[in-house]
Amino acid sequence: MASRYLTLAAALLASFLQVDIEANSWWSLAMNPVQIPEAYIVGAQPLCSQLAGLSPGQKKLCQLYQDHMQYIGEGAKTGIKECQYQFRHRRWNCSTVDNISVFGRVMQIGSRETAFTYSISAAGVVNAVSRACRAGELSTCGCSRARRPKDLQRDWLWGGCGDNLDYGYRFAKEFVDAREREKIHQKGSYESSRTLMNLHNNEAGRRTVYNLADVACKCHGVSGSCSLKTCWLQLADFRKVGDFLKEKYDSAASMKLNSRGKLVQVNSRFNPPTTNDLVYVDPSPDYCVRNESTGSMGTQGRLCNKTSEGMDGCELMCCGRGYDQFKTVQTERCHCKFHWCCYVKCKKCTEIVDQFVCK
């Protein structure tokens, strides 16, 4: 146990040395939606210089692809929302802070929570840019040009306007990874391990979106006979991406640097992680109590479930500190009836319910 905390302390010390490097993030585009004034369409420099959180390489990409920036922000926002959904019942609930770091100091620790955040954010950008291509919102891409799947029935048409996953993947890789690739760290340093970790998890997020995409089809024919189908490539619902990466979070691999400056698994008895797995280099901090040095917001004041034995239960969520009970009034729709034709009319019902919050 003592060695675990010594490892965490060393990681924290190392991470604080790179505060300036990690303090700004492109994730901030999610918090401040990008608006592109008409006057900036020709001259990109004013717009890109005003966007907080971009690295030098990302600013150059912004100048070349400024119409993409809105969708990078949308992708980051999608990733953050999905992160908060997946961790809504955990001590760390992917909460954001009111500055351009978005998540605060907690991202300076190379924990499995950081691994998930990087992966889901990168996935969000692939998702948003791929859809924007299909919708004709971007000047450099259009509908998907993916090859016809070999197992598609011969009499089905391959066409339509699919999500441009190939373009979304390539652009997300170029933009999101730019910050990591332009860093120069001493071989074998903690910072170099974080860079390798971030790049690996970014790729895992992108691959998840790519691998979960599937063929969608529309029927054609007399009276809905479906004698002919037109098919195209379609992204999976982003909830599936979040569910998949959450499973990878639960089984994430603990890594360390070897003498050659490569990440290797701490426990060599396990199979090495694949490009679809998440990796981390630091143990998670204590999320039970508020700690400004680690970025933990603690669980005081969090709602908990008195009857649950899971992570959302009061015993685990409150870390044994106990909980307070209070009553609240909830209003919801009730006694709904369908009226011909065609609407549903409901009444509003109120009830007093017990809620529990951690001390």
UniProtKB/Swiss-Prot annotation:
GO terms, molecular function: cytokine activity; frizzled binding
Biological processes, Gene Ontology terms: canonical Wnt signaling pathway; cell fate commitment; neuron differentiation
Description of post-translational modifications: Palmitoleoylation is required for efficient binding to frizzled receptors. Depalmitoleoylation leads to Wnt signaling pathway inhibition.
Disulfide bonds: C83-C94, C133-C141, C143-C161, C217-C231, C219-C226, C288-C319, C304-C314, C318-C358, C334-C349, C336-C346, C341-C342
UniProt keyword annotation of Magnesium present: no
Compartment(s): Secreted, Extracellular space, Extracellular matrix; Secreted
Any single GO CC term annotated in Swiss-Prot or TrEMBL for this entry: extracellular space
First and last residue of the signal peptide: 1-20
Family matches, as InterPro entries: Wnt, Wnt_C, Wnt_CS
Record PROSITE patterns: WNT1
Lipid-linked residues (O-palmitoleoyl serine): S223
This protein's UniProt keywords: Developmental protein, Disulfide bond, Extracellular matrix, Glycoprotein, Lipoprotein, Secreted, Signal, Wnt signaling pathway
Glycosylation positions in this chain: N93, N99, N291, N305
Role according to the record: Ligand for members of the frizzled family of seven transmembrane receptors. Can activate or inhibit canonical Wnt signaling, depending on receptor context. Required during embryogenesis for extension of the primary anterior-posterior axis.
Family label: Belongs to the Wnt family.
Full protein name: Protein Wnt-5a
Species: Pleurodeles waltl (Iberian ribbed newt)
Lineage of producing organism: Eukaryota, Metazoa, Chordata, Craniata, Vertebrata
